[in-house]
């Protein structure tokens, strides 16, 4: 609509030119007159299109109903055109209004006015022409833009087609991938099913192993319980034998008292005292009967526990299978022991009915007496208070051979008058407060009879229920060993001629387990080793006598290691920290020469030492004791090493070091493989242990060489700082106003030796370990200044030289030490060289390699340092897989 109006306006303007050209004719035509000689009347008709155009313009404007559209159209009309049309309409209206006045004007005036109008119109036309040209240029520009957009549209359509094609191909690939994913899911389900089956099998295998371990532990516990029950049974037998002897003695005492009463009836008419004495004796007998009943109940309890143990053993035997028959105890032997015990054990009702003459024979022989430890541990627990009363009331009696002699009678009445109860025995001469025996000589002792068993002969100078204390216990235990082996050993147990059981079946999986006979007490047996006096299962509390010296230790104290006896070697291993292998050592080691000639493979096979560091510990100790080398590092045990780990700031490895029994000598010969086996994989921790061992070397393995507490802060030298412990370094951090960061050093392995001896350990490394953010530059600068002042100028210069070297790599907390990867050419050496034969010592310096450079204290440490640069840079490449 707007474009049509513009075209109409342009046409009207073109017509205006013709109007201007024929102004006079038009004026004449408008007046209705045509002069002769002018243009014909047809020229007067040229104004008709203008009228039509104006009429069309009016109709077009009427069609624009909205004012906004009219305003928009008006704004598009050029200003001169609108002004001209306005003036034209005003002139037309003025001509209509002043037609009468205009008619009087002359043609010349009208012509001049029209000329002026023509000029103005020409000017307007030129302006409009310029505007039309400008709009034409804009139209051409728009056409060019349109062509460009058309090209872009075509390109976009082509790209759209390509995108559609690629999308189609992607859809096809997607379908293929979905098909492959489905197949992979099926395979995954199958693999998961197989994995579940494998895990189920592995879980069952682990459960089987756990069950086997539990069964092994259960068998060991049952074995220990059986041994304890055997000890308690023997102790009970000995106590019952003592009680029977006491009953016999009391019966003889009663008969003697009856005879004394019959003889002294004329002298003592006081029946009240006699009745009181008889009542007192009756009470003693009743108390003794109650004690016997208690012992019977105890025997019944032990019998029930033994039966329970036998039932559990049968269950274990059913689980283990018939191959474990050789590990079971002899049930017939136990039952025979019970039958023999029941024959010797009289019921409490039968005891007072026995007729015993005043000169009675010796009591019935009981089981062989127990070792001194057993009597000491049970003397105050098992006997009742009635026995204590009877012990206090028992007099000076003497059993000589098979005859019991009564107490001598008083010779005069004055002695009877002094005694309130003349027929009762006097006080027993006991022990002195310091544990020594009284001066009254004993009149009886334990004497072995011809059958090999010992017949207990009571020493009445001592208490009946108290253990007989002596300086040594060898005689007692020899009697016990000979008696038990001679009277109660069973020939039915399947043993080999050399006294060892042959391992069969699942016994190989459990290890070599040696079980004792039910009635056999062998002090050298592995199961009895824990009952040895002075061992782990010794009597609690202070010892009542001097510990028995092992046979042969007195005579071979200065003997070479190759001539050591089995017992001495086992004692040495137990004191050395390898007591868990003593059981197998008793079976395999015949003398010290066995260990001297043994290889690590023999130790693993015969002694069951699977732990490589345990083998290494034993090999080093055997070499040192055979060569009689005086190494100060050997004085530091594995307990000290755990405390040493606390001092150097590595307490997280205490369990591994303690389990491996790492002592001072092993620190001296510690290798990189050993550290990797101990789960020390951090490069920083390797360097920490290396520097700490080096400090020990320089100080000749002085156990107190590390300083744990602050001393003089004003005068610190590198020789003092190198001996700082981790705790001392933390105290130094607190002294330099870094207390909030000091706890971060726990478990870091930072100590004085690492600070001084490690060239790559700088102030930045310490700041990194303290977790000081890099943004806190002032705090890091303060720490670096204090650190450089602490280590001294020589160490500072060495660290700077190290940092300036082209091969320098900064020390980090994440660097790991990995085992060295061996090529095919190293496989032969790898087969020949085992784990515990490696010589790649982490600190190979010997204590005797010291340099006489004492005027430079720092040089004493740095001059002897084994920490060379190429070793430090390549530490993450060391280690060897065995």
From Swiss-Prot:
Keywords per UniProt: Coiled coil, Phosphoprotein, Repeat
Regions of compositional bias (Polar residues) in chain numbering: 442-457, 481-495
Gene Ontology terms for molecular function: identical protein binding
Coiled coil start-end: 101-303
Biased composition, class Basic residues, residue ranges: 502-515
One Gene Ontology term, aspect cellular component: presynapse
Assembly with partners or alone: Forms homodimers and heterodimers.
Stated name of the protein: Liprin-beta-2
Protein species of origin: Mus musculus
Gene that this sequence comes from: Ppfibp2
């Amino acid at each position: 609509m707007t474009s049509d109006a513009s075209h109409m306006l342009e046409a009207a303007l073109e017509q205006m030119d013709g109007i201007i050209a024929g102004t006079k004719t038009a004026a004449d035509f408008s007046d209705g007159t045509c002069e002769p000689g002018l243009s014909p009347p047809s020229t007067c008709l040229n104004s008709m299109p203008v009228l039509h155009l104006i009429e069309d313009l009016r109709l077009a404007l009427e069609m624009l109903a909205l004012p906004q559209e009219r305003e928009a159209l008006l704004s598009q009309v050029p200003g001169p055109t609108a002004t001209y049309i306005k003036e034209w309409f005003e002139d037309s209206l003025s001509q209509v209004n002043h037609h009468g006045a205009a008619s009087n004007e002359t043609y010349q005036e009208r012509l001049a006015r029209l000329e002026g109008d023509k000029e103005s119109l020409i000017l307007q036309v030129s302006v409009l022409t310029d505007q039309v040209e400008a709009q034409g240029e804009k139209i051409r520009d728009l056409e060019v833009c349109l062509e460009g957009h058309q090209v872009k549209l075509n390109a976009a359509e082509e790209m759209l087609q390509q995108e559609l094609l690629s999308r189609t191909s992607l859809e096809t690939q997607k379908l293929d991938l979905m098909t492959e994913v489905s197949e992979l899911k099926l395979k995954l389900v199958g693999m998961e099913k197989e994995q579940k089956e494998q895990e189920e099998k592995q879980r069952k295998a682990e459960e089987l192993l756990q069950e086997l371990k539990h069964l092994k532990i259960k068998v060991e516990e049952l074995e220990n319980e059986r041994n304890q029950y055997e000890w308690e049974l023997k102790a009970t037998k000995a106590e019952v034998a003592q009680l029977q002897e006491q009953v016999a003695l009391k019966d003889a005492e009663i008969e003697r008292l009856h005879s004394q009463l019959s003889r002294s009836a004329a002298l003592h008419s006081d029946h009240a005292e006699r009745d009181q004495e008889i009542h007192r004796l009756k009470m003693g007998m009743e108390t003794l009967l109650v004690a016997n009943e208690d012992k019977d109940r105890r025997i019944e309890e032990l019998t029930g526990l033994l039966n329970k143990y036998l039932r559990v053993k049968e269950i274990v035997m059913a689980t283990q299978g018939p191959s474990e028959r050789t590990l079971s105890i002899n049930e017939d032997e136990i039952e025979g022991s019970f039958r023999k015990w029941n024959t010797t054990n009289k019921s409490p009702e039968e005891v007072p009915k026995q007729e015993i003459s005043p000169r009675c024979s010796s009591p019935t022989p009981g089981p062989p007496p127990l070792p001194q430890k057993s009597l000491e541990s049970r003397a105050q627990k098992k006997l009742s208070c009635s026995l204590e009363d009877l012990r206090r009331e028992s007099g000076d009696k003497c059993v000589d051979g098979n005859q019991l002699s009564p107490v001598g009678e008083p010779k005069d009445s004055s002695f009877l008058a002094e005694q309130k109860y003349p027929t009762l025995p006097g006080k027993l001469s006991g022990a002195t407060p310091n544990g020594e025996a009284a001066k009254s000589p004993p009149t009886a002792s334990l004497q072995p009879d011809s059958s090999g068993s010992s017949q207990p002969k009571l020493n009445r100078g001592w208490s009946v229920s108290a253990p007989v204390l002596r300086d040594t216990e060898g005689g007692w235990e020899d009697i016990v060993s000979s008696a038990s082996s001679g009277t109660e050993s069973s020939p039915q147990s399947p043993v080999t001629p050399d006294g060892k059981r042959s391992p069969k079946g699942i016994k190989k999986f459990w290890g070599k387990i040696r079980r004792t006979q039910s009635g056999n007490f062998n002090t050298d047996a592995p199961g009895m080793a824990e009952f040895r006096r002075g061992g782990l299962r010794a009597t609690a509390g202070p010892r009542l006598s001097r510990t028995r010296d092992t046979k042969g230790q007195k005579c071979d104290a200065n003997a070479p290691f190759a001539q050591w006896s089995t017992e001495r070697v086992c004692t040495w291993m137990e004191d050395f920290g390898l007591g868990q292998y003593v059981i197998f050592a008793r079976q395999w080691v015949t003398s010290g020469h066995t260990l001297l000639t043994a290889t690590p493979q023999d130790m693993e096979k015969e002694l069951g030492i699977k732990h490589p560091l345990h083998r290494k510990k034993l090999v080093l100790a055997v070499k040192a004791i055979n060569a009689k080398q005086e190494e100060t590092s050997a004085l530091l045990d594995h307990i000290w090493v755990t405390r040493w780990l606390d001092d150097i700031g590595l307490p997280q490895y205490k369990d591994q070091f303690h389990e491996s029994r790492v002592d001072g000598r092993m620190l001296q010969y510690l290798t990189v493989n050993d550290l990797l086996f101990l789960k020390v994989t951090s490069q920083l921790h390797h360097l920490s242990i290396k520097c700490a061992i080096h400090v020990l070397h320089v100080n000749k393995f002085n156990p107190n060489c590390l300083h744990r507490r602050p001393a003089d802060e004003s005068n610190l030298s590198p020789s003092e700082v190198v001996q700082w412990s981790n705790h001392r370094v933390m105290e130094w951090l607190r002294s330099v106003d870094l207390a909030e960061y000091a706890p971060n050093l726990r478990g870091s392995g930072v100590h004085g030796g690492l600070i001084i001896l490690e060239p790559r350990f700088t102030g930045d490394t310490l700041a990194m370990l303290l977790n000081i953010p890099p943004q806190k530059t002032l705090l890091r600068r303060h720490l670096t200044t204090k650190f450089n002042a602490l280590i001294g100028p020589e160490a500072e210069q060495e660290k700077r030289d190290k940092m300036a070297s082209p091969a320098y790599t900064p020390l980090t907390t994440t660097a790991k030490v990995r085992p060295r990867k061996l090529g095919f050419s190293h496989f032969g050496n790898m087969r020949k060289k085992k784990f515990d034969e490696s010589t790649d010592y982490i600190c190979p310096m010997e204590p005797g390699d010291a340099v006489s450079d004492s005027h430079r204290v720092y040089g004493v440490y740095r001059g002897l340092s084994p920490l060379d640069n190429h070793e430090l840079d390549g530490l993450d490449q060391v280690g060897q897989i065995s």
